[in-house]
Structures are given as C-alpha cells and as structure tokens.
Amino acid sequence: MVVMDSPVSGRMADQNIDPNTTTSPSPIEKHVSAIKAISGDEKAPSKEKKNYASKKSTTVIQKSHCFQNSWTFWFDNPSSKSNQVIWGSSLRSLYTFATIEEFWSLYNNIHPPTKWVSGSDLYCFKDKIEPKWEDPICANGGKWTMFFPRATLESNWLNTLLALVGEQFDQGDEICGAVLNFRTRGDRISLWTKKAANEEAQLSIGKQWKELLGYNDTIGFIVHEDAKTLDRDAKRRYTV
C-alpha cells in the first residue's frame, strides 16, 4: 500500500484552506485511515462575559473547491504483476477525488516515488477511464513520455498532476491521464491521450507539457496499437 501514516501537509494553506477550523469527517478520512482530520480547537467562550445562557460552540463548514473533472489514483506493484495472468489485472483503484482539498489530502499521504519498489506504477486518470489499452476511451490513443533523473522525479510528477487537475492544457479534453513508472533503467512520466490520429491535438499537448515543466529534450508520441503489436520496436508517431 502506498499510503503512509503522516499528517496533512501545510500545503493546504496555499489552497486557501484554514487548518484551524472544525470540519466533519470527509470521505477520505473514512476510507484512508492514515489521513488525519483537519481540525482545531473550538473557540472558547470569553472569560470577560459570563453568558451561561448560551454556550454553543461554533463550527465553520469549509467550502470545497471543485475541479472541472473527477480523477482517480491507481497503483500497480511488481509483486502483483509477477502473478498476473492478464496484463492490467493487478491494477488497484485507490481513490477518486473531485476537489482541491481531497487532492492534497491524498497526495500528501502517498509515499514519494523515491520510496517505492522498482517496477511500481502510479496513475492519475479521469474518473471512469481505466489506465489500460483496452479501455474504450484509451484504445485509439497513445502517449507522450518524458524521462527524469530520480532527484527531479517527484517535483515533475507533482507539476504534471497540477497541470492536469488544474486544466492547464488547451486540449485538455483529449487527455486521459498521467502515469509515473518507477524503473531501475530509467524513471518516466507519460501522458495518455484519446485519439492518436488527431495530430493537431497531440502536438499541442506535447508542446504545452514541455513548456509547463521546462523540459528541453525531444519527446515522442507512441500509438497504443503500435506498442501492443511491436512492443519496444514501436516507432514514434510524432515528436516535439
């Protein structure tokens, strides 16, 4: 399991969330025990005014900040892969989130990639889309891929996620999700898209992704169908 037992990070403050308010348990807190409730002490009655008639505590209900789309984290690890009969059968859906608050609560309680076992994969896909070639929405698509040194992997993964959930791509409707592959031979992040034949959309996504991350090397787009039939011999359809 990739969820670690640590409190929610102070990054929540950057999203205009006050950690000193009392909130009811969120769905995340109910399903992921490692995530702590974001709450503080209720305001004590003033000592100067002894109003015994009213001792009601005040609860501030936070307003959620919704994303345009809901997203789901998926995970796959080497031990599961070694025993699987059908590719992708070991994929596990972790949690679906739809708000800024849920995203940071989940992200801040997932082990960083550098603590994973080599061969692990973490996915963040739009809800209702499974990170498999066989998924109807992914079937005719492909992926852009970037390679990173381990020292910058986590920051580039986070920036990719923020670009996705924050709808920073002009062709965002064309994107299925992102994948982080933790490998001994080279860590990589990929963006999966829906329609490989839509050259204009694919080139736009590839160029914007490079600009957002400040990535200087050439990246290539490989069609899923080519990858299925040719494996590592699959050629790049587009490059930017």
From Swiss-Prot:
Gene3D superfamilies (alphabetical): RNA Cap, Translation Initiation Factor Eif4e (3.30.760.10)
Residue segments, region Disordered: 1-29
Any single GO CC term annotated in Swiss-Prot or TrEMBL for this entry: nucleus
Molecular functions (GO terms): RNA binding; translation initiation factor activity
Top-level lineage group: Eukaryota
Keywords of the record: Cytoplasm, Disulfide bond, Initiation factor, Nucleus, Protein biosynthesis, RNA-binding, Translation regulation
Sequence positions that bind mRNA: 83-88, 115, 133-134, 183-188, 228-232
Biased segments, Polar residues type: 17-26
Main location per the UniProt record: nucleus
Keyword Nucleus carried by entry: yes
Summary of subunit composition and partner proteins: EIF4F is a multi-subunit complex, the composition of which varies with external and internal environmental conditions. It is composed of at least EIF4A, EIF4E and EIF4G. EIF4E is also known to interact with other partners. In higher plants two isoforms of EIF4F have been identified, named isoform EIF4F and isoform EIF(iso)4F. Isoform EIF4F has subunits p220 and p26, whereas isoform EIF(iso)4F has subunits p82 and p28.
PANTHER family, sorted: EUKARYOTIC TRANSLATION INITIATION FACTOR 4E RELATED (PTHR11960), EUKARYOTIC TRANSLATION INITIATION FACTOR 4E-2-RELATED (PTHR11960:SF44)
Family affiliation: Belongs to the eukaryotic initiation factor 4E family.
Protein name: Eukaryotic translation initiation factor 4E-2
Organism: Arabidopsis thaliana
